[in-house]
Design a protein with these regions (language model features):
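Short, non-ligating residues that shape and space the ligands of small metal-coordination modules
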Residues: 29-30, 61-64
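Histidine-centered catalytic micro-motifs used for acid/base chemistry in nuclease
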Residues: 33-37
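Catalytic-site neighborhood detector that most strongly recognizes the C-terminal catalytic loop/helix
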Residues: 72-78
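Short beta-strand-alpha-helix junction that forms the catalytic/metal-binding core
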Residues: 20, 42-61
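Short, solvent-exposed loop/turn segments at secondary-structure junctions
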Residues: 3, 30, 40-41
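Short, charged surface segments at domain edges that flank catalytic/cofactor-binding sites
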Residues: 1-22, 79-104
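Short intrinsically disordered terminal tails
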Residues: 106-108
Length: 108
């Protein structure tokens, strides 16, 4: 008998190694949440490429912000995301890198 297929939530958590992609914490599974990297209210979809594992704290801090805005001023979380969120769409990763570059580039 084959085991039951994983739910989307279980699949995303497993892909992200049951860790928050933002802070790298590994809380108990009941404290993990799914986060829309690009919020649905801002055009993000329900695809696996737009979903990541987040702890409750990071999900609440990010709220309805797109990941590039949330991560632009937080080098540690940004680095964690780029290392841990291998399943997100490449365009999202590019947007995060571009936003970070704009913050550190001197004016002029």
């Amino acid at each position: 008998m084959n085991p039951a297929p994983l739910t989307r939530r279980e699949r995303i958590f497993a892909r992200d190694h049951n860790r928050c992609v933002y802070c790298n914490a590994a809380p108990p599974a009941h404290e993990l949440t799914l986060d829309h990297v690009e919020p649905r209210v801002k055009g993000g979809d329900q695809s696996d490429g737009n979903l990541v594992t987040a702890c409750k704290t990071c999900n609440e801090l990010k709220a309805g912000s797109p990941a590039w805005a949330f991560l632009a001023g937080d080098a540690e979380r940004r680095e964690n995301f780029l290392l841990n969120a291998s399943g997100v769409w490449p365009r999202i990763r590019r947007a995060i890198l571009e936003a970070a570059e704009k913050r550190v580039r001197p004016a002029g």
